[in-house]
From Swiss-Prot:
UniProt organism field: Saccharolobus islandicus (strain Y.G.57.14 / Yellowstone #1)
Family in the record: Belongs to the PEPCase type 2 family.
SUPFAM superfamilies per the UniProt record, alphabetical: Phosphoenolpyruvate/pyruvate domain
EC number(s) reported in the record: 4.1.1.31
Protein name: Phosphoenolpyruvate carboxylase
Enzyme class: lyase
Transmembrane segments: none
Gene, per the UniProt record: ppcA
A Pfam family reported for this protein in Swiss-Prot or TrEMBL: PEPcase_2
């Protein structure tokens, strides 16, 4: 049986600090190849996700890794000891990137040939897994698996002319199959994940399956509590399915450093391991790697790699029904507030520092993530914008919990263990001055302000959260937030950008 990675380094652009080895503030090109090598060699991460979704991708990464760092990769076999996993564009969703999907799939046999030359015959398959984002049905992942088998791996048998086959020209094509990891990002698909996995299992008959649960995008679209509870439902469903099919399922969770995006940081990883029992692989995003002291980062990754994997909590039907009800109540409260703040979020997001050479995510080419009726930036910019205007998104929608009875509240607390801790971590950055300033700048309605005030009042009076600065860093962040809003109002944008960067350094994450 292959090693199932415990940690997966990603290219999420959530870092405030720029690593010393980067040639510029934007990590791109050859720097991303170097970053992949350093993730393995310096940080001890088991797996690197190579992203072809929403950005220009280098499909020659394996060639560059093996030729630039031969000593390391002779000792650590790519595909056996350490892993490289492609994140594809979803051709159903990202129309302009359909051919990038095809190009990335076509590059997999090239990596196989390179490994044959480097390691010798039959030693390893360097790239054998792909991640499909925004998966909503089993048909999508079945189609990806079959596309590779039929359109890529089997093309070597095509006859060109008069008995001459493709393989006579380019050689035989390997691997013959790939493993597809669904990345499930929307609430309904997370809560019905068993249908996606079981459908794929019945058709493809894999020996095991890795399933990627998003934590960041569902938080943006439906609110933090909805995201957490949807992941808990998904983990329970996957565990039950694994038992009933007698088939191993290894969940991956996509978590960032701030509470809204998962709260996996070198300072909080133990609580996240406790929160998401049953998860095999945790994403190590850029803020985790670059915004904390290196020794602390390396030690945290080592601890995650060596931690014990506990079984997921199996939910009884009545518990699951309560959690589903909470996600609906929470989203109904959260989304209208976000829609009202959309102009502010979009205006601030374009001023945040850029950390990756990503294509535009607004307009014809690219995909703005949407919550309800409005378009929003990517989750990192979304979170960074709300923190910067002094309203951490973790607080939005919280008063919907007032609809729970005592039994429902107990079920909620049992299934979101670190709820109060996550909320308190975020609430330190709440800025009381924000209300007047955002009303003035973006003409935010009194109704929206009143709803946010209800949420923060509930957080304070019922949950017992202290809002606002409690130490030097949080007080400085609040001051910077006011200065940012004042400079933005006066259109002194160079100063606005400076304050945004300073706040991100304090948070140890852009968003």
């Amino acid at each position: 049986m292959r090693i199932i990675p415990r940690t997966m380094s990603t290219q999420h652009p959530d870092n405030a600090k720029v690593p010393e080895w980067a040639k510029s503030e934007v990590i791109e090109g050859e720097d991303e190849v170097k970053e992949a090598f350093l993730a393995y060699s310096m940080y001890g991460v088991h797996e690197v996700m190579w992203d072809a979704e929403g950005k220009d991708v280098d499909t020659h990464v394996v060639r560059k890794l093996l030729s630039n760092y031969p000593d390391y990769f002779r000792e650590h076999i790519l595909g056996k000891d350490v892993f490289l996993t492609y994140r594809l564009p979803n051709p159903k969703v990202e129309g302009a990137d359909r051919k990038v999907f095809a190009e990335t799939m076509e590059s997999i046999p090239i990596t196989y040939d390179l490994a044959e030359k480097f390691y010798g015959n039959g030693i390893t398959v360097p790239v054998f897994e792909v991640i499909l984002p925004m998966t909503t049905s089993n048909l999508e992942i079945i189609s990806v698996a079959r596309y590779y088998e039929k359109a890529v791996a089997n093309e070597d048998e095509l006859e060109l002319y008069d008995g001459v086959k493709v393989k006579d020209l380019v050689g035989e094509i390997y691997p013959k199959v790939i493993e597809v990891i669904p990345l499930v990002e929307d609430r309904d698909s997370l809560q019905n994940i068993d249908n996606i996995v079981e459908g794929y299992y019945k058709v493809i008959k894999p020996k095991y399956m890795r399933v990627f649960l998003a934590r960041s995008d569902p938080a943006m679209n439906y609110g933090m509590i909805t995201a957490v509870l949807s992941v808990k439902i998904a983990l329970s469903e996957l565990y039950k399915l694994s038992e009933s099919l007698n088939f191993e399922i290894y969940p991956i969770i996509g978590v960032g450093s701030l509470p809204f995006r998962g709260h996996l940081s070198p300072e909080n990883y133990e609580k996240v391991l406790e929160e998401y029992k049953g998860v095999y692989t945790y994403t190590i995003q850029s803020a985790f790697k670059y915004d904390y002291d290196y020794d602390k980062v390396k030690s945290a990754i080592s601890s995650i790699n060596n931690s014990r994997i506990g079984p997921a909590k199996i939910l009884e039907k009545y518990e699951e029904d309560v959690l589903r009800k909470i996600t609906i109540l929470y989203t109904e409260r959260y989304q209208p507030i976000i829609e009202s703040l959309a102009n502010a979020i979009n205006d601030v997001s374009v001023l945040l520092p850029r950390r990756r050479a990503r294509k535009l995510h607004i307009g014809l080419f690219g995909y703005s993530r949407s919550a309800g009726k409005v378009s929003l930036p990517r989750a990192i910019s979304f979170v960074g914008s709300l923190y910067s205007i002094g309203i951490p998104p973790e607080l939005i929608g919280i008063s919907s919990l007032s609809n729970l009875d005592e039994k429902e509240w107990d079920i909620f607390k049992q299934n979101y263990v670190n709820f109060k801790h996550d909320l308190q971590t975020a609430a330190r950055f709440f800025n009381w001055e924000s209300f007047e300033l955002i009303k003035d700048i973006w003409k935010i309605s009194e109704d929206t302000i009143a709803k946010i005030k209800e949420d923060i009042d509930y957080a304070e009076s019922v949950i017992g959260i202290k809002l606002g600065g409690i130490d030097y860093d949080s007080r400085k962040h609040i001051l910077m937030s006011s200065l940012f809003l004042l400079s933005f109002k006066e259109k002194i944008l160079q100063e606005s950008k400076k304050y945004l960067y300073e706040m991100a350094l304090i948070r140890r994450s852009l968003g």
